[in-house]
Amino acid sequence: MTNILSPEKSENDQELPIRPSYLQEFVGQQQIKENLSVFIKAAKSRNEHLDHTLFYGPPGLGKTTLAKIISNEIGGNFKSTSGPAILKVADLAAILTNLEKNDVLFIDEIHRLNTAVEEVLYPAMEDFELDIIIGEGSAARSVKITLPKFTLIGATTRLGLLSNPLRDRFGIPMRLNFYNTGELKKVLNRASKLLDIDLTDSGSEEIAKRSRGTPRIALRLLRRIRDFAAVDGKSRVDKEISDFGLNRLEVDRIGLDSNDYRYLKFIADNYNGGPVGIETIAAALSEQRDALEETIEPYLIQIGLLQRTPRGRVITIAAFEHLKMPVPNQSHHQFNIFNENE
């Protein structure tokens, strides 16, 4: 699922020039910043590596950025890979044996590591040892390699898919939450200075309100609104051009786009608001279940338009009101289903 409001990273996002390098530059996630600052200072004062850290939460909130910041703060090299990229034990062994003391190894989508790779990762995380089998059959032998003290940082949008043994080996688990409008305005104002964009306060407010609580989306929208302003002959990004551009991009006043409307209207039109199973929704919309669960549903739940119940997805009265559709009589009963099974 690719669209202007997708929180997934795009090759066109070009975040490097505006990506913060240190904790004091990072906007939002205040509790996480404060705790990380304490943990990093304590580790450095003891001349120890930082405990392995797990960032989880919706995409686009800064998990990769925070991992790079940690690397900068502790003075180690930053090595990055992803769960799907580590196909074999040999792939992991090659990465681990090239690490140096205090290096940060970042594994994105860590929930997608296969079981064989995970089992080799356990002693590497706990004892900083790599146990691998050399050879085959009767000639096979176990080789133990001592690894330097490194910090593994995992990132996932699907904490529930992470195995318990792997999750338990992270000493610092941290959940990243959606940003509020004020925090997103700070993100936009910082970026506008670095990108030399004349962004007014009202323009920043308009973009922030329609960015789904996600910095990555806010920055992407800022670039596109800048394009509309330039072609329209405007030297600054104000509320008027922001509203015009966002409407052209089909982003409504609360940050919903055509994909969100398709999702909500399918449940409203065909199931009177639900409940309906996620597989049914995915098949009807010709989307992958993962794409719906990671890209569309988190924000709809966050703003109170959708509920996940034991019997399926249910859209709320607020969703019907936003769609300007009459609320079916049974809707009140549907919401009681959620409460009874919670």
Swiss-Prot record:
ATP binds at I18, R19, G60, K63, T64, T65, E126, D127, F128, R169, Y179, R216. It comes from the Bacteria. The keyword Ion transport does not apply. CDD domains: AAA (cd00009). Residues 180-250 are annotated as: Small ATPAse domain (RuvB-S). GO terms for biological process: DNA recombination; DNA repair. The RuvA-RuvB-RuvC complex processes Holliday junction (HJ) DNA during genetic recombination and DNA repair, while the RuvA-RuvB complex plays an important role in the rescue of blocked DNA replication forks via replication fork reversal (RFR). RuvA specifically binds to HJ cruciform DNA, conferring on it an open structure. The RuvB hexamer acts as an ATP-dependent pump, pulling dsDNA into and through the RuvAB complex. RuvB forms 2 homohexamers on either side of HJ DNA bound by 1 or 2 RuvA tetramers; 4 subunits per hexamer contact DNA at a time. This is Holliday junction branch migration complex subunit RuvB. It comes from Rickettsia conorii (strain ATCC VR-613 / Malish 7).
